[in-house]
């Protein structure tokens, strides 16, 4: 009822005691049923200040007089002034607070229940005084702060305490409640909230106040009427308005708290108080609100007699007995009238609302209708588009088919197919119409067949459709379910598509029926397709299931002629004897094999369709699917395929659809294209046969083959489609890839790339996000170790970068080198070698080519030229032989010395021969003994093979054995240890040439070195010659080693080296170990090899000897000298380069860092300069703004100053100048 606080407006009738500010508590009149009816129930509870005031003047009359006076005043002054403050229900409610200390008044609210009489008599508090009101108001506010905020005086306004209102009980509008008690009983006092029984309003009987209730307070309190019952009209119990009266007094809304305590239903609150005044009372204050219609004043309690004093201007007058009767009647009538009007208005309102609702509904319906129409239009448009698209697709398909046909089918077949397709097409319409019926029949037939389909785990053709995915429907049985899901998704689309296809088919049919017939004949002839094109199509589906092969058989599947035009074969295609999925003739596989093969196969298949039929059928269904090739199909192929499966599922439609869709699909493209497509698809499908079709198709088809009639087959044909579909947009066939395959591929990729990919059938773009998130996640994890990822290393190498580990290794190497260099004047070759990891020459010795092969290689000359770049020369067989002879001589001479020198050479060899030293010297010695045998054996075995006649052989065996003892022991060991490492290959090339010689030479030289004496006797000339050669060779070797990597040398070297190689112990050893394939033909029969080997030996020995010579000489002069020939120089240079590179890298990285820094700084600088510029411009703006404002100010000042002087004139003329 907050709304009702009329503080401002309602003059409280009770203003009477304005001056006193005391509240007279009228014993609550027992409320008549009307809650509000106030009957003096004599509950002292409400005694209020007034009562206190009254008490002193025990004389009733005095009290009345006073009241009257006050009433007069208040009406004018107080009403206007106070009433406003007072009428707040809040006050009333806060009756506990407001009713001074008497009874907790508890807001008295009319029980929401209705106007049932509150159990407790309402207490009427008269709070006429402003002060009191003020106080009360505040109190009440605190008290009832929750209730209405208007803390008015307790007024007549009966404002049920807000709580009640809040509670939702209809609050009785204050005007209703507020009885216009002259005493300013506040309605709250009147209305008692049943909820606040605490009010001690004792009133067991509503209407009657038991005498006992009359308390002292009551007596003392201002009572305009005697307590005695006689004062009350008997008819109206004390004030109890019987319901009728109450009704009269109170507006119905008051009586029954209106369900909507909505202001609309209450009398205007603002006028409440005035309303309470009955028209009979004069309303003195002109400004006061106009009295409301009498009905509004339910003031006069008819039964109450107000003392005449009160009646004067005070509202009390109303209550005077004189008026009470009249007013009661009048009020009653008014009330009734008003109630009538209210009811009328209510009804009106309801009707209004109904009408509104009707209109709303109407509008809704309108909207819906609009939407419907819109939708219809949309559909129309779509259909139009579809038709156009189909048209286009068909044209494209035809073109494509024409282009493709040749490639796929033999011309005859193509024509046949084309005719067939056309016919099919035409027939499709016919058939679809007729055939459709047939197909439907087929479908019906196939429907039963589907039972067979059970094979497919899910009978749903989807499975077949899955076949869609791959052609091997046959194989795919299991997977079909997955496929099925996919297919199912697409099925709806496909169905739509099929319907469209059917329509198109019919149109085309008309156009092409003649052609199609002719074509069909041709087709049948060509394809041996007994299947009628259209029915075939229809059948395809059904038959597909039944006999996938015939269905599509591609053109090849002629088995069932039924397919193409005719109704589904009555007899299921040959029992799928060939049901074996593998057996299925997979056009795709055929295609894959090659068109030719396929064609042949098709033909052969056709030839023995019986055998292949079942399988073929299975495959064919795939093919059928292929029909999807039509451009439209291609486009919609997937959709179609699904629909096809759907069709299959929906047996009747499917067949037509099958036929139609398959047929028509190809049909769209054009029969030829369709066939071509078929073939293509067959190929693709077969190619794809993979799981999808296999799964679906397999099911469908297997089941088909197994169950000849199974209608699911048609879907299978769809499957083939997956392989290739004609892409309308690309205008070319494109491979149709099943989602499963895609999924699979993605998963595989993901595995390879190292991220996790979950196979999710429903994979779609939205999953991309997840995958991306996952990738992010993975990216945040520690990366693969660089060193273990060759890809990464390769990538880094592009930028000249390497991994930290490698860098550290390099640095460590450098450090080691430096230390070594500092420690020993000359770097120790072995370390260098190992560091360089230059395989010991021996390792490199083995080669696959024989010298002859190498000499005969096509680019032999080029290779020779290449060698010359490194100052190397190719040695012809003759030269080699000469050299070898020389070596033999030298060896023979050396042998004696060698045996003696062996020990020395062993000691020396480690330091002398890099190769030997490579393997640890100690080991070498040990190994000499241990390995000698092996080496020797090897050398012996090799030697015989390679040995030259007599002399060579003799010399060699001894020498070899010796050499092997030395070299093999050291070299072999080194080699053995190294070779496994795989250095062999490396060294092979570099060393092939130089190394091989070196190998042997080294040992020889060592031995020689050890016993240089044996050489002394040697002829000086020869020695010089050999020395030169050895120097030459060592240089070459060094070069080779450095450029060893260069395979080029290998070619020629290989030849040369091969020969020499096989002489090399390393080779021998390797041969003994695991004879390398052809160590330069070492393994070849000695005879074959004899020439070159001998040469090799000669050359090697020669080299060796030369080197020995050289070494010997060197060693004689400086036995300990470790000069490694150019190699060392190269090594040093290499290191130098590397260091430089490292340095460069470091500098580059620093440079890069600096550049980046510089860049970022320059950016910042730029930004700063921008901001500075901005600030400057702003400053400029501010300055100009300030100037402008200043100017304006000055102007204003002028204006303001001048006008004062010439004001009048200024006024008239505008601003004075």
Swiss-Prot record:
Residues recorded with modification Phosphothreonine: 433, 907
* Modification type N6-acetyllysine: residues: 496, 739
Kindly state the subunit structure of this protein.
May be a component of a BHC histone deacetylase complex that contains HDAC1, HDAC2, HMG20B/BRAF35, KDM1A, RCOR1/CoREST, PHF21A/BHC80, ZMYM2, ZNF217, ZMYM3, GSE1 and GTF2I.
Q: Which UniProt keywords apply?
A: Acetylation, Coiled coil, Methylation, Phosphoprotein
Instruction: List the cysteine pairs that form cystine.
Output: none
What phylogenetic lineage does the species belong to? Eukaryota, Metazoa, Chordata, Craniata, Vertebrata
Q: What does the UniProt induction comment state?
A: Negatively regulated by miR-489-5p.
List the protein's name. Answer: Genetic suppressor element 1
Give the GO biological process terms.
gene expression; in utero embryonic development; placenta development
Which residues lie in coiled coils?
321-403, 1127-1201
Region spans: Disordered:
1-155, 324-385, 418-465, 526-579, 633-675, 699-720, 807-858, 903-930, 948-981, 1068-1122
Q: Which organism is it from?
A: Homo sapiens
Q: Which InterPro entries is this protein grouped with?
A: GSE-like, GSE1
